[in-house]
Amino acid sequence: MMKCVIETASAQVFAQMSAYIAERNSRDALFPEAVREGLSHAHVEAEENGLRAPSAVVGTLLATLAAGGASGHSQGAVCVTPAAGVVGLHILRGLPEKATLTCIEPEAALQNSAKQAFKLGGYSPSRARFLTARPLDVMGRLAADSYQLIYADVSPLELTAFAERAWPLLTAGGTLVFADSLLDGTLADATRRDRDTEAARAADDYVDTLAADHGAVVTRLPLDGGLTLVTKR
């Protein structure tokens, strides 16, 4: 009984903090009005298309990672998600002015929606490039050791293959972010043996091998559906 009370209280506190952060972001002088307009458009588009989009908390984390991972060797960041309008605006807010965001998504309509969001956000077309293709088909075309941030919202069945292709693309200090990789905590349920859960567990084990074999720093965060961050040192 006491455990349930504590868990409920913790959930309420987290919800309050998340609401406060979202409210602060909505009136932050450092958060340009144009970006807020672009985000509003992108969120509406994501909702209408039934897409998952990161919370305000995760969005500010992405902006911080984009800013903190900047280096002279970086070409920018990579965004692999149907909700590229939301994710991309947060990342662009943190990227250096001359850095480029590469968006990969097979559906042209979703790419066009992201382009409109970036335009409303005040970013020139030169700040983003769009590859209309399956991510695993084109990751090999990207330059190695060139990206400070790679964000991936992909099927659990593709997590390991994506990590294998994304890891060489990161610069030193760069981070790979897997959205919803912990499947809302179902990885901890030993009775779950469906394909998605097993694939997500395999990917979770794989990122630990990156830590063991390559010195990666792996961080798991209970945000949204569960984030996994893999940083190259």
Please describe what each predicted stretch is.
Residues 1-149, 156-171, 175, 181-233:
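A short alpha-helical cap/connector motif
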